[in-house]
Amino acid sequence: MKITLVSSCGLVLEQDGSALLIDALNKQFRCYYGLPPEVFAKMLAGEPPYDAVCGVLFTHAHPDHYSASRTEQLRAACGAPVFLPQPNTPERLMMQLGPFTVECSRFPHIPVPGMAEAPHAVYWISAAGKNIYVTADAQIDTERHRTILHGRRADAAFWNGQYLSHPETRELLLEAAVKNYIYHIPVDEKDVCGIRRKCERSMARFGAELPDVSLLEQYPSSLEA
């Protein structure tokens, strides 16, 4: 499975000629990297790998993860199903989108002062024997993650940088996946919000105990699972 980070938390998963988008239709918001207009234009035009988009998923509706206008434009262009968690979304929901089996689990958002609460979910995504765990802005709750994982270990997992800051979350990373990626990292030159510096300091301090953890600081970044 090919995985491409196209924006702050925007992932494109490719398998068997199909593409699944997760949090990929955001716009620039504060210090967070938005999907470039030229990439969005390729999506609308159906240029590869966007010629067979089988689904568009969002973890929540905050603007660094979701743009309603871009979502409606892409839905009109390609007809792919769109899923955004709602207040009445079940605690656990299964979906089949092309070759991807998607397990959606409700999970509260990390508290952010001044930011409205939004229904939030994490995703366990399987295709062709590979498993991906996408956590976006899930609050720090290791036991809830363990309940969702239920002893499973992903081939790749994607985490907010705050998961580097606590001993219990660093331990979780080692359990949760073969390869762990810290994403949602700003690329503004001055790093006004300080998130990139904090992630880099954490890796400098704890990297020896996290051999299978990498920072995703380049857009786009391409990976294989």
Feature names for model-found ranges:
Residues 13-17, 97, 124-128:
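Active-site beta-strand termini and strand-to-loop segments that position acidic
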Residues 2-5, 20-23, 101-109, 131-137, ...:
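Active-site-proximal beta-strand elements of phosphoester/diester hydrolases
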Residues 111-176:
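Active-site-proximal loop/helix segments of hydrolase catalytic cores
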Residues 1-30, 34-42, 197-201, 205-225:
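Zn-dependent metallo-beta-lactamase
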Residues 16-56, 69-73, 113, 139-152:
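Pre-active-site segment of Zn-dependent metallo-hydrolases
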Residues 89-99, 117, 148, 170-225:
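Binuclear metal-ion centers of metallo-dependent hydrolases, dominated by the metallo-beta-lactamase
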Residues 21-23, 52-64, 68, 83-86, ...:
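Active-site neighborhood of phospho(di)ester-bond hydrolases with catalytic His/Asp-centered motifs
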Residues 31, 43-101:
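Active-site HxH/HxHxD metal-binding segment of metal-dependent hydrolases
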